[in-house]
Amino acid sequence: MPAFFCLPMACQRQVDSIDRSQSNLQAIPSDIFRFRKLEDLNLTMNNIKELDHRLFSLRHLRILDVSDNELAVLPAEIGNLTQLIELNLNRNSIAKLPDTMQNCKLLTTLNLSSNPFTRLPETICECSSITILSLNETSLTLLPSNIGSLTNLRVLEARDNLLRTIPLSIVELRKLEELDLGQNELEALPAEIGKLTSLREFYVDINSLTSLPDSISGCRMLDQLDVSENQIIRLPENLGRMPNLTDLNISINEIIELPSSFGELKRLQMLKADRNSLHNLTSEIGKCQSLTELYLGQNFLTDLPDTIGDLRQLTTLNVDCNNLSDIPDTIGNCKSLTVLSLRQNILTELPMTIGKCENLTVLDVASNKLPHLPFTVKVLYKLQALWLSENQTQSILKLSETRDDRKGIKVVTCYLLPQVDAIDGEGRSGSAQHNTDRGAFLGGPKVHFHDQADTTFEENKEAEIHLGNFERHNTPHPKTPKHKKGSIDGHMLPHEIDQPRQLSLVSNHRTSTSSFGESSNSINRDLADIRAQNGVREATLSPEREERMATSLSSLSNLAAGTQNMHTIRIQKDDTGKLGLSFAGGTSNDPAPNSNGDSGLFVTKVTPGSAAYRCGLREGDKLIRANDVNMINASQDNAMEAIKKRETVELVVLRRSPSPVSRTSEPSLNGSSHQLNHFDAGSPDSTMFVTSSTPVYAS
């Protein structure tokens, strides 16, 4: 009989794993301490405030998870658990590690993330068996100087801290495969970073780097490199010597050009180079035969190289917000292309070869100067979205055939064509031969049209060659790609008539995640209040009503007159370094909208709630002086340079009443008038002000 009673107790002593996670525990249950041979204890997601000293008598414990509790102290007795191989202290309130941690010689995984550490003891590096060390979201200002002693380290995560420098010994981590230093305050990387020959993933985004060490090419195993949101001007010339690189993110920097060795990146699949200062795209890009996604938005590109057509595996090409006047004919060789976004350029025509992109599902050419579209768009059977305007309510439009009298060829058009600012019969390619070549493509052997009669797509439904249904509705604009960085803006914004290239004054200074959320909510509330006060309507009007209201608004704008007053405005940049204004015009650009031909610089946007708004700057103000620099005959570049010099910006402006480009004094009348929702305060990229509709789907 006693044997039957002893059996359960014997079984209990053999228990080696206990899971009491999410049990609303205030303390470690006493019954746990009876299991002397316990090896795995999971107490995550409870309300435990301290670790009972009896816990440290469980000498066989190998895995201890006390993450997501309310621990403030890690007792020195932790050093008694000499068999420990995994310790998870994530999401607690521990501010200091005891030196006795060095006794845990078998420790392989240590997670200290989301604790208020300001420093780690040097003795932690005596645990040379550690392979994974997580230090994300602490308050670390320094890593241990002897971190190179962790010779078995494979993963080091130190994202979202206050690190300004990296110990030189880090280059001794020859087995390191993943290094995440993103969202810190780093100004430089160790010159010998290339010694990390096993490194596969390197994230150093959202820092203050101005360059990358040349030695980085020594990381020949690297396949993921993210240096986005820094202040990098040039990339190392030998960047192409990383043969395994597949994903490269250099977004939001000040990069002028890509290195000549770029074509050596034969395995590169994704390149994000948006929001830089690129004026030219190297022809070497065509040698990156594995490239599937290419993001070049918000640069200063005036053309694309012909070698773009060599990218046969390219599925996504985004060149929004540049200065492109034409697209090379070779684009037709990109047979895998599914998304082509050319929004907000100065395109006057698309090549006939666009019809050879047989897999194209989204074509975005809004905010250009296109008088019509090439007839070959009729053979894009898979097209689900054709964007021609910011005010467009349907993804696919009814297109009809017409003729280009200048070239004598058939083209297609719709009620949104010609686009605003389209110049009848004149393009900006500047090459007669170029135009001749494109015209000669008509009737060529690679694209054939069954019906040459002037019919609408709707009437063509019974044609022998089915041209697809161009009446599909509610096709969504493509979602943001799965890669890290988000889009610039998710709003459908109104298009400006006669809109020149706009400049936005944005500092490179970045906010923390917490402060950004607060500012986002504040901006959203301000926008909502202002919309309510001014009666701004966001409903989409019919094309006929838009045309009538546009005429009325044009007449009203011509009546703008009255007294002119000089104002001196001092603007203190906010915590993020932003002013919250945009301007247009200047000596080297077209006149600002509604400026009556005045070549001066005019404020075209003041973000509600911004520093500029609070200091009294208003849309329509003409810049006279900026920080003691004369703006009468200045260019936009001159203004930018003058304004960026100081934290406190002093502007002398000339204000006419009523304001010549006022947008907030009257309710929104039509699709071409300006609304107040110019940017999405909840977007990861809401620091960039956008002055026209940009439903961007690239990440």
Swiss-Prot record:
Record region (Disordered): 656-699
What's a single GO BP term from this record?
A: positive regulation of cell projection organization
Task: Please give the PROSITE patterns that the UniProt record associates with this protein.
Answer: LRR, PDZ
- Expression (tissue specificity): Expressed in the terminal web of the intestine. Expressed in seam cells. Expressed in the basolateral surfaces of epithelia and the nervous system. Expressed in the intestine, epidermis, excretory canal, reproductive system including vulva, uterus and spermatheca, in both larval and adult stage animals.
UniProt keyword terms in alphabetical order: Cell adhesion, Cell membrane, Leucine-rich repeat, Membrane, Repeat
Q: State the superkingdom.
A: Eukaryota
Give me the LRR repeat coordinates as residue ranges: 37-59, 60-81, 83-104, 106-127, 129-150, 152-174, 175-196, 198-219, 221-242, 244-265, 267-288, 290-311, 313-334, 336-357, 359-380, 382-403
A single GO CC term for this protein reads: basolateral plasma membrane
Q: What happens when the gene is disrupted?
A: Worms display a severely affected epithelial integrity, leading to abnormal morphogenesis of the pharynx, intestine and embryo. RNAi-mediated knockdown causes defect in the apical junctions between cells, electron-dense structures are observed which are discontinuous and greatly extended along the lateral membrane, or absent. Results in polarity defects and strong cellular adhesion. Disorganizes the ajm-1 containing apical junctions in embryos.
Q: How does it sit in the membrane?
A: Peripheral membrane protein
Compositional bias (Polar residues) spans? 659-676, 684-699
The reported result of mutating residue 305 to L is: Abolishes membrane localization
Which positions fall inside the PDZ domain? 584-665
Which Pfam families does this entry report, sorted A to Z?
A: LRR_14, LRR_8, PDZ
Location(s) in or outside the cell = Basolateral cell membrane
Give the protein's biological function: Critical role in assembling adherens junctions; adapter protein involved in polarizing protein trafficking in epithelial cells. Necessary to maintain, not establish, the entire terminal web (organelle-depleted, intermediate filament-rich layer of cytoplasm that underlies the apical microvilli of polarized epithelial cells) or brush border assembly at the apical surface gut cells. Required for correct localization of ifb-2 intermediate filaments in the terminal web. Required for dlg-1 and hmr-1 lateral localization.
User: Family assignment?
Assistant: Belongs to the LAP (LRR and PDZ) protein family.
Protein known as: Protein Scribble homolog let-413
Species per Swiss-Prot/TrEMBL record: Caenorhabditis elegans
